[in-house]
């Protein structure tokens, strides 16, 4: 714990002031504000002028849910992040695990797109389909010119009236049917896009057998076809108000925000202690979120602060990958932890990929703090700051990636744990 306090205090003092340099507030409007900058795997940004106007995102654009709420005298004020609809994959897209399919490489006879069509003579394989260079996402090699695919989806209930989507990757183009009804029929390329299903298509999704059928064309070049069925879950509206943002200020090792939340002022700093003369500290997989609450009217106020995160931090494709969330305590600290179930270490490569191995951590001081984990794996801390005119504290965000780099086929440990005998808990203490 003393190690933690010394690093945090040194970083705060350094970025606040030095003996001969006065820190000047940065008034430039950033295209995106850095919040968490542990490494390219674990980074989070705000692409809004006000911190509460948009969801927090990874640098690739994928949402990394992070929501902060300050409750003053029973009134909640959201100062960080924003809720957004979530996708629940009823039939998963291809990842480390493929999906069963029947396919033909020549034009089949009859109404091959219909639900009750007999495809027993077709070839059995696994999706996704495409060029071998796209493995491990590809499970059946195919490079063209055409492939006919049928994917059976077993449902345990009707989805009539639900907000349903087709998730589609098709390079070059495809005609796609759901239970015999055309959903996509054009020459557009689709790269992980969501296509809303019309009411008649959604009404056709019944308990039992359903079929997604497609003919995919790839005249030349690299090929890929992946399809899934998705339900978009509505936002669970909460009654909190938003804070009033006073400023946003980006400095070399921190991004600072100021807010008013009713009768109190809230200052929040996202801090990354990247002292370049200390490689162990630079590689340390921990960032801080510090906060300070001050009464504006000189009166004591009852204040609670909460920080929420989703398992999206620990997976490449949130909603499509299974996750596990848990909580535990150690040496005066309270931990929230999220991990993918598959744990395929350094098993993927590409331009739009995120880490899906190792574990994400949200950490707080144990005193006066409650840790919550929902059935969906969402995690939250609620800390009671009591009744006072001034209070302060911090949360920590970290990631244990186990292995960071693959070098000529060999997985190498992160520098902070290069000997393999350092625990992630010690990095928070």
Predicted regions, residues:
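Sec-dependent signal peptide recognition
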Residues: 2-8
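C-terminal motif of bacterial Sec signal peptides marking the signal peptidase cleavage site
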Residues: 15-16
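Acidic/polar, glycine-enriched structural segments that form the non-catalytic walls/loops
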Residues: 19-34, 43-44, 49, 84-114, ...
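Aromatic-lined ligand-binding clefts that engage carbohydrates, nucleic acids, or primary amines
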Residues: 122, 145, 153-180, 212-214
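Extended, loop-rich substrate-binding clefts of extracytoplasmic carbohydrate-active enzymes
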Residues: 134, 142-146, 236-284, 365-377
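Short beta-strands within extracellular/lumenal beta-sheet-rich domains
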Residues: 141-156, 195-199, 254-257, 379
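Short, surface-exposed tryptophan/glycine-enriched loops
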Residues: 154, 192-217
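Edge beta-strands of jelly-roll/beta-sandwich modules across compartments, strongly enriched
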Residues: 218-229
